[in-house]
Amino acid sequence: MLYFEKKEKEILDVLDKYQRNMVTLDELKAFQKEVQREILASGLEVDPDDNYNFLRYEKYWILLDSIVREKVAKEKIKAHVYAIKANDFMERVAFSNEDTTGPLGKIDKPLLYFDNNTYIYLKKYVPLERITKKYQFVYSPAHLEEMANSIRREDFKYNESIERDLRYLGNLTNNVEFLPNLQKGIVVKSESPYNPLRRVIENFDGTVLSEEMEQDFMENRSRIKAELSLKVKGSTIEGVLSSTAAKKALSSFDWYPEYEQEAEKRLFWEKHKNSYSFLFTDLACIDRIVDTLDNNPEPARKYRSHMHDTTHLIYATQSDIFVTNDGRLYDKATEIFRFLGIPGKVVDYKEFLPEMTNA
């Protein structure tokens, strides 16, 4: 192991122990002084093969110094480490055929949005030449967030499968993407998947914060349900948003009286479907109400996948067809689409697979 490769590992190890309260702040300070003394005393020159490790080591050294000076709180260390690794990943990886973005032409066929499980199945078992041309497949940043999460699990190490995944996604959708827009809610754009992946990785600290908030919610669903005295019968979520308990929870939203007064829910949806705040705040809250009232909730340990499912559901509201390979997400999307009068069709991938492919 090269010298600065070793030092980088030592810093990461001691920071991990500090976060887990296995090392005190005084011991962290002593570690810093010892490393500093060792490097100054050695007068080492950086080996060319060790150059990248040295550059990363410097970033971790600055982080260590900020922690020792108590400028970075213990609970924020993980986000800072991820940010350094993500930045290094983006600097070192030179994607081939990166920018395949082109102008978006007129789309004259139904928009088909798919969750990540469906995408995994398609790229594994269905060659692109077998994909039907009857539908316009559309991806979203949520697909790249899930890909970035896999990259993080591999500690930001690059491998060629990332290239293959991006290439398949771009070709499957012809680079057609749903993107959030403050003025229009969600818009359809043409963009190579490489670009949103870069954005997601470069802003990974925001993803970590979102995951922490999602984990907190899922771990406290039962308490919230008890405190608000929300009770529903049944083992499924079908019709749950029309229950007395749901009405009690929904009554805190400014838009709910308008919803109640509108007999034709489709008209309510048409009025709000282009509102960024309704889509990314209120719709996410409706999703949480469904989860809170669910008598068979998803385990709290699955908070990451749950967060991505919510985001997929939000983007799916803009499609004509939403294909999912997740039974729980299918039930939830079906209930929310029914409740809001969303005209899109929610389908199970197994039933819809013949429609998506050419025999």
What function would you assign to each model-found segment?
Residues 15-18, 67, 71, 151, ...:
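Generic structural signal for hydrophobic core residues of well-folded globular domains
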Residues 325:
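Conserved residues at the C-terminal ends of beta-strands
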Residues 40-47, 52-63, 80-318, 328-359:
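Active-site-proximal, substrate-binding regions of enzyme catalytic domains
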Residues 25-33, 51, 58:
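Short, charged, amphipathic alpha-helical segments
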Residues 1-22:
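Short terminal alpha-helical segments
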Residues 17-27, 43-50, 72-79:
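Charged, low-complexity interaction regions
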